[in-house]
């Protein structure tokens, strides 16, 4: 259950270091991190989660979504992904190795996707995941 004292807000430049440290700790996509692409979930002024929306000319990509261990399974990740989708102005994709989480939020696995996402797919496959473990999913609105 989402904590009552949770707030979701756009990240500030001052949040950049914490986001980067947590993203690295969680082995998430840390390529070209820009603080202004993120939202953060805060509880008692502490960042407990974060999510990123990368905007490309042809689509948007939900990426680098993480929640600290003690706050997982409380719906915070889902809440952040829904907020990122809400703010997107184009088709939304995600490249992931946890498709069940994103299926619950309305994403479906696709075989065709914008070429701009191929680099991310290749990165995931090079990072100890095989073809059957890396999924590109599209938000079905």
Task: Describe each PLM feature range.
Residues 29-40, 44, 61, 130-133:
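A short helix-loop-beta-strand connector motif used in the catalytic cores of GNAT acetyltransferases and
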Residues 40, 46-55, 59-66:
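Conserved beta-strand in the GNAT
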Residues 96-123:
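Conserved active-site alpha-helix within GNAT-family acetyltransferase domains
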Residues 65-72, 98:
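A short, internal acetyl-CoA/4′-phosphopantetheine-binding micro-motif in the GNAT/acyltransferase core
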Residues 5-18:
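A short beta-loop-alpha structural element at the N-terminal edge
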Residues 73-86:
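Conserved acetyl-CoA-binding loop-helix of GNAT-fold acetyltransferases
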Residues 115-141:
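C-terminal "cap" of GNAT-fold acetyltransferases
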Residues 10, 21-32:
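Helix-loop element at the rim of GNAT/NAT acetyltransferase active sites that forms part
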């Amino acid at each position: 259950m989402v904590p009552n004292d949770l707030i979701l807000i756009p990240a500030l430049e001052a949040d950049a270091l914490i986001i980067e440290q947590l993203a690295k700790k969680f082995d998430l996509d840390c390529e070209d991190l820009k603080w202004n692409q993120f939202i953060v979930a805060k509880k008692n002024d502490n960042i407990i989660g974060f999510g990123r929306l990368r905007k490309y000319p042809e689509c948007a990509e939900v990426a680098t979504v993480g929640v600290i261990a003690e706050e997982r399974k409380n719906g915070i990740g889902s809440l952040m992904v829904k907020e990122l989708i809400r703010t997107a102005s184009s088709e939304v994709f995600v490249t992931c190795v946890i498709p069940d989480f994103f299926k619950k939020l309305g994403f479906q696995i696709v075989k065709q996707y914008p070429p701009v996402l191929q680099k991310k797919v290749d990165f995931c496959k090079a990072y100890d995941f095989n073809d059957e473990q890396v999924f590109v999913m599209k938000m079905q609105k």
